[in-house]
Amino acid sequence: MKTTFLDFEQPIAELEEKIEQLRFVQDDSAVDISEEIARLEVKSQALTKDLYAKLTPWQIAQVARHPQRPYTLDYVQHIFTDFEELHGDRAYADDKAIVGGLARFNGQSCVIIGHQKGRDTKEKIARNFGMPRPEGYRKAMRLMKLAEKFGLPVFTFVDTPGAYPGIGAEERGQSEAIGHNLYVMAELKVPLICTVIGEGGSGGALAIAVGDQVMMMQYSTYSVISPEGCASILWKSAEKASEAAETMGITAARLKSLGLVDKVVNEPVGGAHRDHRAAAQSLKRALAEALRQVDTLSPSELVEQRMEKLMGYGRFKEIAA
């Protein structure tokens, strides 16, 4: 698949286009230009590395939304085996914006839950652009309780602009579904490993992100509102989104420094969308380490440690002047 370049990546796009043109010439020419192609490839890699080392929060938000970024099912394919998807909330419907089921992680049975966006127009509509309705969160809760019943660790993958704000969703209890999930996850007696893989949008993300270990991919974001939404409220203009992103502290590195996430998972040069397999391998190592840290704890120890962690959010010390 041809890489889609973001606006700030235009210097890389121009270089990659030149490389493609030379490859085309190479195929139809007796002249050997492989050394020139190799030189430009090295230059492109260096330019990409340099550019991504200096991304602004707003640019990171764009990378987190990249249309070719790996989604939950992509990571499931590369990291887990024997995945068996389970459907429905047993109360209303099956929400395709959240996927989940049983699988094996390094041979160990587990439960997987995650937001799922679509690639093409038809799938995006079917997945509701990754915005779950109440039945999606209730499906997630059903799977969590199933995991608890059989003593299985739970892995969740967060990637949503937010919970769906439609009238039907509100009528069916969107806020109650999110709140109930928070309550259930706080007291779940099995290991919970949560990873933000793309967008972590507000309560829609938090509803499957209360865990013993909370991680973020390097170029993912996590915030109470989108930068555009924040800008529209504070400055009455979405054009101030870059300023809002800077102020809100939405990046993995920033949230790690604040103690709100436990680990930042490195991505390949140029972002996870450049190399799904490499991104998945990096995440797999992080998941294995995270599970190792909590897998030996008793159910009561898990809940006690998790509650202590939750109660510590927002804690601060006053220093006398």
Curated annotation (Swiss-Prot):
A molecular function (GO) term: acetyl-CoA carboxylase activity
Catalyzed reaction equations: N(6)-carboxybiotinyl-L-lysyl-[protein] + acetyl-CoA = N(6)-biotinyl-L-lysyl-[protein] + malonyl-CoA
Keyword Nucleotidyltransferase: no
CC annotations in GO: acetyl-CoA carboxylase complex
Superkingdom, natural source: Bacteria
EC number, UniProt record: 2.1.3.15
Enzyme class: transferase
Cellular location(s): Cytoplasm
Record-linked PROSITE patterns: COA_CT_CTER (PS50989)
Transmembrane segments annotated in the record for this chain: none
Protein keywords: ATP-binding, Cytoplasm, Fatty acid biosynthesis, Fatty acid metabolism, Lipid biosynthesis, Lipid metabolism, Nucleotide-binding, Transferase
Pathway where it operates: Lipid metabolism; malonyl-CoA biosynthesis; malonyl-CoA from acetyl-CoA: step 1/1
Residue ranges of every copy of the CoA carboxyltransferase C-terminal domain listed in the record: 39-293
A Gene Ontology BP annotation from the UniProt entry: malonyl-CoA biosynthetic process
Keyword Nucleotide-binding appears in the UniProt entry: yes
UniProt family annotation: Belongs to the AccA family.
Function: Component of the acetyl coenzyme A carboxylase (ACC) complex. First, biotin carboxylase catalyzes the carboxylation of biotin on its carrier protein (BCCP) and then the CO(2) group is transferred by the carboxyltransferase to acetyl-CoA to form malonyl-CoA.
Subunit annotation: Acetyl-CoA carboxylase is a heterohexamer composed of biotin carboxyl carrier protein (AccB), biotin carboxylase (AccC) and two subunits each of ACCase subunit alpha (AccA) and ACCase subunit beta (AccD).
Name of the featured protein: Acetyl-coenzyme A carboxylase carboxyl transferase subunit alpha
Lineage, highest ranks first: Bacteria, Pseudomonadati, Pseudomonadota, Betaproteobacteria, Rhodocyclales
